[in-house]
Curated annotation (Swiss-Prot):
MF annotations from Gene Ontology: O-acetyltransferase activity; xylan O-acetyltransferase activity
Short sequence motif named GDS motif, residue ranges: 227-229
Protein's name according to its UniProt entry: Xylan O-acetyltransferase 12
InterPro entries for this protein: TBL (IPR029962), TBL_C (IPR026057), TBL_N (IPR025846)
Protein localization: Golgi apparatus membrane
Similarity-based family: Belongs to the PC-esterase family. TBL subfamily.
Cysteine disulfide partners in this protein: 153-204, 175-240, 184-484, 400-480
Any one annotated GO CC term: Golgi apparatus
Knockout mutant characteristics: Stunted growth and reduced plant height. The double mutants tbl1 and tbl2 exhibit increased susceptibility to the bacterial pathogen Xanthomonas oryzae pv oryzae (Xoo).
């Protein structure tokens, strides 16, 4: 290295001295002639002498500095390369250790038994760190909401976690398509804690709802919710979850009798709700005027309803509330034949028997008419009511009014929720499997059982606002069946989103 430096200095010394160069500068006229511009003018020639200064001490020092800079740069690059290789080796070793430690831990995750997070630590820094970690898990999961190495994740088993950073998913006051019957904060409910609970499955994560991806999934397609007012509750939730992401003037709500349509023109997508509380044709088919206590279904008539939803790309049925007894000894009528043909016959049956008749007719129709290569079918589980506060140690006169916390009893089940009806639905829909038609059950019942705090009660408007006398009588007028929005139905739709996008 040093011999190269001295050789360089000797070469510099040889070039030292004074050099004289003579530059001949032609006048503009001469330059014009050279370019072919012939003018009768004399050519003027100017001479200029340029002197180059000798390369002295300053030049030598400059060369030395430049040389040392080059040598230092090469050495630094070599050192950094060695450091990078060492860091890579350490990182690979740590990654292997983490993988070995995580293998037994993945099995332990599913063994969690707690339903709720301790209230005293919900707002603590530790809770925030845990939530951030969970978000990272969701963002990097394998797509089905499960942990690595787990083939199936049961989203319906888990706990409610208070989360004031990512909940609610939207503002009920800003959703322009919300219905007054579930707009609780609009009608005077001041506590908003019910909006900030997030459902956390045991041992896995529920995929986060992405409205833009969901709308893209619905591009040129139609999603239909078919059922009663609880299903309409879920439909309103879905509309509120996506409408904020659609520009004004590019969305619309259309009423057409029993059909309500939300249209997203940007995507040529439609999200419908169709009123059909008993699934078959019945005396309750009018979405506004219908008799609740005296119910009649036509056992062999479904075509009028089916013509509305059979060509949809995605269908979400529900049917539970209207099959429940409103009083002891309540029954219903099943009609066979028609009065027009003169063969009408009415049978009186138990409510649950009518439910089975309706599901079998629906299944028969789906098996014969649905396009299994196009349409995906879902059936929402039973939505529990919280009308009897004594079930959790409260006052029945208030029903679920003034409740601000979920029920913190693991695996809590209300005595009024009929789980056998869902078992019957699974059994009946299972007969479609040999035909290649799968009805996916949205198992929403258990997670909803905990949420006694999430109903509209008196904070709602049903056609007309409640009077002062009605507000003062919650035992009759508090709605503990439907759900405030934002709220529990948002999680139902997260289930639907997860199935549509990841399974």
């Amino acid at each position: 290295m040093w011999s190269a430096l001295f050789s360089h200095l000797r070469e510099v010394h040889k070039r030292s001295g004074v050099k004289e160069e003579k530059l001949i500068m032609k006048s503009p006229a001469a330059a014009g002639e050279a370019a072919g511009c012939h003018k009768p003018q004399a050519t003027a020639t100017n001479k200029m002498t340029v002197l180059q200064s000798p390369l002295g001490l300053r030049t030598i020092l400059t060369s030395l500095v430049a040389f040392f800079i080059v040598v230092s740069s090469v050495s630094l690059l070599f050192d950094r390369s060695q450091d990078a290789q060492a860091q890579l080796a350490v990182a690979q070793h740590q990654h292997q250790e983490v993988q070995l430690k995580q293998k037994p831990a993945s099995a332990a995750v599913g063994e969690q038994k707690s339903v709720f997070v301790d209230q005293s630590s919900l707002r603590s820094q530790e809770a925030q760190v845990q939530w951030t970690s969970e978000l990272q898990d969701v963002a990097t999961d394998s797509g089905d909401g499960g942990v690595d190495g787990e083939e199936e994740c049961n989203w319906s088993l888990g706990r409610w976690v208070y989360d004031n950073s990512s909940r609610p998913l939207y503002s009920g006051l800003k959703c322009s398509f919300i219905f007054d019957e579930v707009a609780c904060d609009k009608y005077g409910r001041n506590d908003t804690k019910y909006q900030h609970w997030r459902w956390q499955p045991h041992g896995c994560n529920l995929p986060r709802f992405n409205a833009t991806k969901f709308l893209e999934k619905l591009r040129n397609k139609r999603l239909v919710f078919v059922g009663d007012s609880v299903n309409r509750n879920q439909w309103v939730s879905m509309v509120c979850m996506v409408e904020h992401f659609i520009p004004d003037g590019r969305k619309m709500r259309v009423y057409n009798g029993s059909l309500i349509s939300f249209k997203a023109f940007e995507y040529n997508a439609t999200i419908d709700f169709y009123w059909s509380p008993l699934l078959l044709e019945s005396n309750s088919d009018n979405p506004i005027i219908h008799r609740v206590e005296y119910r009649i279904i036509r056992a062999d008539r479904i075509e009028k309803h089916a013509n509305v939803w059979k060509d949809a790309d995605f269908i979400v049925f529900n049917s539970y509330l209207w099959w429940r007894k409103q009083r002891d000894g309540m029954t219903m009528k099943v009609m066979y034949g028609s009065f027009e043909d003169g063969d009408a016959k009415l049978d009186e049956v138990e409510m649950v028997d009518g439910y089975e008749i309706a599901l079998k007719k629906l299944t028969e129709y789906l098996g014969a008419n649905i396009n299994k290569n196009k349409t995906r079918i879902f059936f929402a589980g039973s939505s529990p009511a919280h009308s009897w506060a004594s079930n959790w140690g409260g006052d029945d006169n208030n029903k679920c009014l003034n409740e601000t916390e979920p029920i913190q009893i693991e695996d809590y089940r209300s005595a009024t929720t009929d789980y056998g009806m869902m078992d019957k639905a699974k059994e009946i829909f299972g007969t479609l499997e040999p035909k290649g038609i799968h009805v996916q059950i949205l198992n929403i019942t258990q997670l909803s059982e905990y949420r006694k705090d999430a109903h509209p009660t008196i904070f709602r408007r049903q056609y007309v606002p409640l009077t002062k006398e009605q507000i003062a009588n919650p035992s009759i007028y508090a709605d503990c069946t439907h759900w405030c929005l934002p709220g529990v139905p948002d999680v139902w739709n997260e289930f639907l989103y997860a199935y549509l996008m990841h399974k």
